[in-house]
């Protein structure tokens, strides 16, 4: 197995594979790390994973770490770009296979990733999302190169359908020799431990967060003559759009003052349009289409109630954003959602039309009777729950733990794959690990590490990026990042 040896500013560290050895891969700094975030999902495509990577990276940069991000090219966005505070992003020219995830053969990405890891003197690889093929590739190659690895799982999976079975098997292979795993809720942790057959001791729970300065209440934007229910989500099956199509006609018939404001785009939008047409609700059901992140708050503050109909969710950031804007939240009781907000701020329902209608009627009664807490009071409570600085601090502790661990040498890694992943999958990926190791040797022969120029650090202790934006101020970059839901 390869060892990572520290190098100076003028000399890149060597990543020479050595099958029988392992070593401490942390560099000569004890308090800061060179971190590479890897995922197929990043700006300009935006969602929960993308926002998590961006915000976490900004806070880690603020704490003195060097952070870069690696993702695939999005249209004309290729090569190297810099975001706020010098966050360096590599947009790799890899082919997208499905739903913004790249195709993988394990080998085609090794030359590019190896070059980046050596050039940037990376010590910790932090991959995100089970759906990202590039994240799994980076974990696999990092272990071949002798780098410490961390993986954050943002999703919940079942165990019965074919898609879940295949994804769970891939996750078992990727995580069996990963140093540490992070989940966004305790429900997500239980799910991941079962799916990947992991030791719970190497799995930590670190939730998502929101920037409370981006989601502040504005009661004057509400129309008190009506009661507005806001829905902001992708209009897909997993988000419960079919449930929403059953709720709208039932409650609109019962409450003439009830209006629905729906933001988001997806294949299930046609169902909502059919409901609006069938029941002649054009003046009471407004479909806004895809929203950018900078517009979400302006939509939320127009409502009294926020409705979430998700059928599965590891950690729902949307309900935290809505509560931060002072809305009463009504949500399905699935996945990690019951862990997100206290009972005083959320009405939990079963994922059925009847239960959600009952929950909404309870919230409507509170609005009519004036018993809801003031939006400003709700905001002041929520803003103390989840902050990105706290997430970064807890993630930093994971990095400290990981940096003191040794990477499995090749023979132990092969034993782990065979014993942990089953006789067929285990031997197959053990063979791939050996081939990847031989390919790495070939690449090092073709282009030795010493021939790869060391990049100037935009972030970290030796950062060349001089213009630092404080996180407690509004930044233009936030306006550039769009979050289509």
From Swiss-Prot:
One of its GO terms (cellular component) is glycosylphosphatidylinositol-N-acetylglucosaminyltransferase (GPI-GnT) complex. Pfam families: Glycos_transf_1, PIGA. The chain crosses the membrane at residues 423-443. It is found in: Endoplasmic reticulum membrane. Residues 444-485 are lumenal. It is an enzyme of class 2 (transferase). It comes from Mus musculus. One of its GO terms (biological process) is GPI anchor biosynthetic process. The gene is Piga. Pathway: Glycolipid biosynthesis; glycosylphosphatidylinositol-anchor biosynthesis. Component of the glycosylphosphatidylinositol-N-acetylglucosaminyltransferase (GPI-GnT) complex composed at least by PIGA, PIGC, PIGH, PIGP and PIGQ, DPM2. Interacts with PIGC, PIGH, PIGP, PIGQ and DPM2. The latter is not essential for activity. Interacts directly with PIGY; this interaction regulates glycosylphosphatidylinositol-N-acetylglucosaminyltransferase activity. Interacts with PIGQ. The modification Phosphoserine is found at residue 21. The keyword Lipid biosynthesis does not apply. Residues 11-23 have a biased composition (Low complexity). Residues 1-10 have a biased composition (Gly residues). It catalyses: a 1,2-diacyl-sn-glycero-3-phospho-(1D-myo-inositol) + UDP-N-acetyl-alpha-D-glucosamine = a 6-(N-acetyl-alpha-D-glucosaminyl)-1-(1,2-diacyl-sn-glycero-3-phospho)-1D-myo-inositol + UDP + H(+). This is Phosphatidylinositol N-acetylglucosaminyltransferase subunit A. Its EC number is 2.4.1.198. Residues 1-26 are annotated as: Disordered. Residues 1-422 are cytoplasmic. The lineage of its organism: Eukaryota, Metazoa, Chordata, Craniata, Vertebrata. Keywords: Endoplasmic reticulum, Glycosyltransferase, GPI-anchor biosynthesis, Lipid metabolism, Membrane, Phosphoprotein, Transferase, Transmembrane, Transmembrane helix. GO terms for molecular function: phosphatidylinositol N-acetylglucosaminyltransferase activity. The keyword Transferase applies. Its main location: endoplasmic reticulum. It is a single-pass membrane protein.
């Amino acid at each position: 197995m390869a060892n990572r040896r520290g190098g100076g500013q003028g000399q890149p560290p060597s990543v020479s594979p050595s099958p029988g050895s392992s070593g401490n891969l942390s560099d000569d700094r004890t308090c800061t790390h060179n971190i590479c975030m890897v995922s197929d999902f990043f700006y300009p495509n935006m969602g929960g994973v993308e926002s998590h990577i961006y915000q976490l990276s900004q806070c880690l940069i603020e704490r003195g770490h060097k952070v870069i991000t690696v993702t695939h090219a999005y249209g004309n966005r290729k090569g190297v770009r810099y975001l706020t505070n010098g966050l360096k992003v590599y947009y790799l020219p890899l082919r997208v296979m499905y739903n913004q995830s790249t195709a993988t053969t394990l080998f085609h990405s090794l030359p590019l990733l190896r070059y980046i890891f050596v050039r940037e003197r990376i010590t910790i690889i932090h991959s995100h999302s089970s759906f990202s093929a590039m994240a799994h590739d980076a974990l696999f190659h990092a272990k071949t190169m002798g780098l410490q690895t961390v993986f954050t799982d943002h999703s919940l999976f079942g165990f019965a359908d074919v898609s879940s079975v295949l994804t769970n098997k891939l996750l078992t292979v990727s995580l069996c020799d990963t140093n540490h795993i992070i989940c966004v809720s305790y429900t997500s942790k239980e799910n991941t431990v079962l799916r990947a057959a992991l030791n719970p001791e190497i799995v930590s729970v670190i939730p998502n967060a929101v920037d409370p300065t981006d989601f502040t209440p504005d009661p004057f934007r509400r129309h008190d003559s009506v009661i507005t229910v806001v829905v902001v989500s992708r209009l897909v099956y997993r988000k419960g759009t079919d449930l929403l199509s059953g709720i709208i006609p039932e409650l609109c018939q019962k409450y003439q003052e009830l209006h629905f404001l729906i933001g988001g785009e997806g294949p299930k939008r046609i169902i909502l349009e059919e409901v609006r047409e069938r029941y002649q609700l054009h003046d009471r059901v407004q479909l806004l289409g895809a929203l950018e992140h900078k517009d979400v708050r302006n939509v939320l503050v127009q409502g009294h109630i926020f409705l979430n109909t998700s059928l599965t969710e590891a950690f729902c950031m949307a309900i935290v954003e809505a509560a931060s804007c002072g809305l009463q939240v009504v949500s399905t009781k699935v996945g990690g959602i019951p862990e997100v907000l206290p009972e005083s701020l959320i009405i939990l329902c079963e994922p059925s039309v009847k239960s959600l209608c009952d929950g909404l009627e309870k919230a409507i009664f509170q609005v009519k009777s004036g018993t809801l807490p003031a939006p400003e009071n709700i905001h002041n409570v929520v803003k103390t729950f989840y902050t990105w600085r706290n997430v970064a601090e807890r993630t930093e502790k994971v990095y400290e733990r990981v940096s003191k661990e040794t990477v499995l040498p090749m023979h132990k890694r092969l034993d782990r794959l065979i014993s942990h992943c089953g006789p067929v999958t285990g031997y197959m990926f053990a063979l791939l690990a050996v081939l990847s190791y031989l390919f790495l040797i070939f690449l090092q022969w073709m282009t030795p590490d010493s021939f790869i120029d060391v990049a100037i650090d935009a972030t970290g202790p030796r950062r060349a990026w001089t213009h630092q934006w404080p996180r407690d101020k509004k930044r233009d970059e936030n306006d550039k990042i769009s979050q289509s839901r």
